[in-house]
Amino acid sequence: MSWGNAVIGIRNALAPPVITGCDDTGRVSADFHLGAAYEGPPGHVHGGVSALILDHALGEAASPDGKPRFTGSITVRYLRATRLGPLHAEAAITRTDGVKTFCAGHISDDEGVTVEAEGVFITPRRLRD
């Protein structure tokens, strides 16, 4: 676990309680619970928190070899309000093109997907072969 990461860093008292895992296919997922500290509209998750979690999940998926890839762009689509409570996030690579890795993911609750995201992640120059 990272010490200083804004999403999962244990030194960040406001980091959402998200711990990601990766399956054999490279899909990153997390089951977590967001409470009042992450509230935007009454009873619902702040949209910026959803974007933060998805940026992190997509970035984890984009870096299966342990080499970090940095967000080049991210597009977030809010399908409906995300209620506070138990949630699930998933992300996976959709394709690669040179130094660019394309990923897609979502957050869902017990009624289905609430937020979707797509991102392009770039391998930094210092890590290119």
List each model region and its residues.
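Non-catalytic linker/capping segments at the edges of enzyme domains
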Residues: 1-31
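Active-site helix/loop of acyl-thioester processing domains in fatty-acid/polyketide metabolism
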Residues: 24-27, 37, 44-68
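Intrinsic-disorder/low-complexity, polar/charged segments enriched in Ser/Thr/Lys/Arg/Asp/Glu/Gln
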Residues: 25-29, 73, 86-88, 102, ...
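Residue-level recognition of well-ordered beta-strand positions that form the cores
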Residues: 31-33, 75-77, 90-92, 106, ...
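Conserved short histidine dyad/triad with adjacent acidic residue
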Residues: 33-39
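A short, polar/proline- and glycine-enriched secondary-structure boundary/capping micro-motif
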Residues: 40-43, 126-128
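Hydrophobic beta-strand-centered segment that forms part of the acyl-chain substrate-binding groove
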Residues: 57-88, 93-94
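HotDog/MaoC-like acyl-thioester-processing domains
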Residues: 82-84, 94-129
